[in-house]
Amino acid sequence: MSSPINDYFIDYNPLFPIFATRIAKGLAIYRVSDHARLAVIPIRNINLVANYDWDTTTGKFLSIFFKDGTIRIHDIFKDGRLVSFLRIPSTKISKGIWDRIPLRYEPNNRDFACNIIDDLPKLIRFVKDSKRINIVPYTQPNSLWRGPDEDDLDSNEKLDVHVVFNEGNDKITVFFNGDYAVFLSVDNIENENSLKSIIKVQDGFYQCFYEDGTVQTLNLGPLLQSKSSVNLLNYIMVIKELIGYMLTHLEFINRELATPYLDFVKRLCDEAYGYGKLKSELEALFLLGEISCDLEDWLCNSVGEKNFKRWKYLGCEAYQKTVQILTLIFVPACERIIIYVEKLRAILQAFSIQNKLSYTSDLTAVEVLLKSSQKLLTMTLNSIIGLGRDETLFEKFFIWFNDRLHEALDEDYKLKFQFEDDLYFGYDLLSYFDRILSKKGTEPSSIIDVKLYRDLINSMSDMEKDIAQSNVNSHIQQHILVDLKTDVFAQKYPSSQINLLDAIKLPKHNYIVYLIQVTKHNSAQEPFSEENKKKLYIGTLKDENLGIISKESSVKIPALFKSYRLSSTRFVPNRVHSLLRDIGLSDSNYHSSHVTDYRGENYENEEDDGTIAIPAYIRENRENDDFIACTAKVSVDGRSASLVFPKEKQNV
C-alpha cells in the first residue's frame, strides 16, 4: 500500500478555490467551499506520477509529470479532458514545475526591421469530414492550452516553460512551449540525494531543495532579458512547426487525394481490362472510330454512368485540391521558412560577431536549410504549373470519353463535342492515354512526386535539428544559469546530519519556509539519544540569496506522534479541518477522528525558548491501522502552514 502522505497530497489552484488530490484511480479536483468533485483525471497507475503543477496564468489547466518522461496537460473546467500529451526524449522524470512567463519588452525605436510575417495572409489547413474536404483556420499544435485566453488579462506573449529533473539528478530539461527541449548537464549533483522541492522565486528563477539540505539555483533570467535570444528560440520552434505543417499536408495529399483516385483508376482500367489493351483500343477508337465488343462491354458494364461520375469526381478532386494545397499551404510555408531562416542566420551572425573571441558559429546547416527551402518553393511552383496542364488533359479526356460512353449506352445519343474546334485536342488526348493508362500512370508520382517531396522535407527537418543542436541549444544553454549547490545548513550544524523534509514559498512574501530534521552524530563518550533522531526545526530563508531571516524554531513533537514517520513530514498550507475533511472524502475508510490539544508540561510557566508546541489532529483507519496526523497551523512570521505526518508501518 502506498504511503498515506502520497494519497492525500493536496495542491491548491493559485487562482480558483479548488484543489487537486490523489485518489485510488487517479487525480480528483474538488471545490474548497463545499468539497464538490468537479473532475476526475483517470490514471491507471498513480505510482507513475512524479508530481503535478497548476497553470498559474489562467488556472484552468493542470500539468501532470509522469516518471516515464511524459507530461499530460488537462483542462479542469472541461471534465479534466486531456488537451496535450508531451514527451521529453530520453528522460525519466523525478520532479517538474510548470512556469508561464509573460514576455515584456520595452519598445525600441532603433528597431528598423518590420516583421514581414505580420503582413502575410494567415495560415490555413485542409481537413476532411465524412463528406468533403474543407478549409479551416490553422491553429498551432499546442493552442488548446497556449492560445489566447479571454479570461487572461495579460495580453503579452508568453513563454511556457516546463522544468524537469531526471531521476538521476544529473540532467535538467527545460521544455519550451511544449515543443522544444534544451538539456542541461549537472555534474555536481550526487545521485543519492533526491529532489524534495522546486520553488519558483520569480519568473524563470527557481530554488531547488535537495534531501541533504543543499540548494541549487536555476536562473533563466539572462535568457528572458535578451530579446534576441528569445527570438532565436522562437524562430527555430516556428521553423520546426512549419516543416511539420507541410509534411502533414503532404501526407494529406497522398492519403485523401492521390491514393483514392489512382487506386480507383487501377481497379477500373487495369484490373477490369488491362492497361495495354485499353490504351490501344481507345487509340483505335479515337483515330479510326472502331470499337471492339470487349471495349463496348467494358464501357457499358464496368464503367457505366455511376463509375464515370466517380472517376470524374475523384480526378477533379485530386488535381484541383492538390493545386489548392500547394498554393495555399506549401507556398506560404516556404516563404515563411525562408524569412525565418534569414532572421535566424542574422541573429546567429550577430552573436558570433559579438562573442568572436570565445564563440564562432558554424552556419553551414543554416545555409543548407535556406537552399532546401528555396528548392522546395521552386519545385512547388513547377508542380502547380504541371498540375494545371494535367488537369486540362484530364478535362479534355472526359469531354471525349463522355460522348464515347453514352454512344455505347444509347444508340440515339447526340454528340456534344466537336474536337475539330481544338487544333491540339488529338495530341492532348493521346498524351493523356500515355500518361494515365500505364503502370507508371497510377504511381503516386503521377499526381505529384510524393517521395521526392517527402525526402526533401525530411532533409529540411534534419537540417533544423542540426541547427537546433549545433547553434541554438548551445546559445540557450549559455543563457541559463545553473549554480553550484549551496549547503545552507552546514555551518549551523557542522556535526549533524541534515534531512530536508519540505520547503515552501508563502504567497505574496519574499521568503521560504523550510522544515528540516537534524540528527546529531554521537561521539564515543556521548550516549545515543533517541531525542536527537527526532529533532525538527522550522525556519525561514530569503528566496533569492537564501540568507537566513530569523532564528529557526524547534518543533516539540507531541507524544501522540511518537509512532509517526517524521522523515515524511511536509507542509500543507491550508486549514487543518479542511485537510481532515479532504481525507474523509478521499477515502471513506478513514471514519474516526481524534482531536487532542497538546500542551507541554508546565506550559503556562514555561519560558519562550523559540520552541513551537503543536496541537495534534489524528485521522485513523481502524481496518488497516494506518493513520494520517497533522498539526494545527504553525505560525512563522505572521504566516501559517500545517504539518502532516504519516504513520510508521509496523513490522509484522
UniProtKB/Swiss-Prot annotation:
Q: What is this protein called?
A: Anaphase-promoting complex subunit 4
Short name of one Pfam family:
ANAPC4
Q: Does the keyword Cytoplasm apply?
A: yes
Name where it mostly resides: cytoplasm
Checking InterPro entries in the record gives: APC4, APC4_long_dom
Q: In which pathway does it act?
A: Protein modification; protein ubiquitination
* Keyword field: Cell cycle, Cell division, Cytoplasm, Mitosis, Nucleus, Ubl conjugation pathway
Indicate the quaternary assembly. The APC/C is composed of at least 13 subunits that stay tightly associated throughout the cell cycle: APC1, APC2, APC4, APC5, APC9, APC11, CDC16, CDC23, CDC26, CDC27, DOC1, MND2 and SWM1.
One Gene Ontology biological process: regulation of meiotic cell cycle
**Biological source species:** Saccharomyces cerevisiae (strain ATCC 204508 / S288c) (Baker's yeast)
Q: Which gene encodes it?
A: APC4
The answer to keyword Cytoplasm applying to this record is yes
Briefly state the protein's biological role: Component of the anaphase promoting complex/cyclosome (APC/C), a cell cycle-regulated E3 ubiquitin-protein ligase complex that controls progression through mitosis and the G1 phase of the cell cycle. The APC/C is thought to confer substrate specificity and, in the presence of ubiquitin-conjugating E2 enzymes, it catalyzes the formation of protein-ubiquitin conjugates that are subsequently degraded by the 26S proteasome.
Q: What else is known?
A: Present with 1332 molecules/cell in log phase SD medium.
What GO cellular-component annotations does this UniProt entry give? anaphase-promoting complex; cytoplasm; nuclear periphery; nucleus
* Localization (cell): Cytoplasm; Nucleus
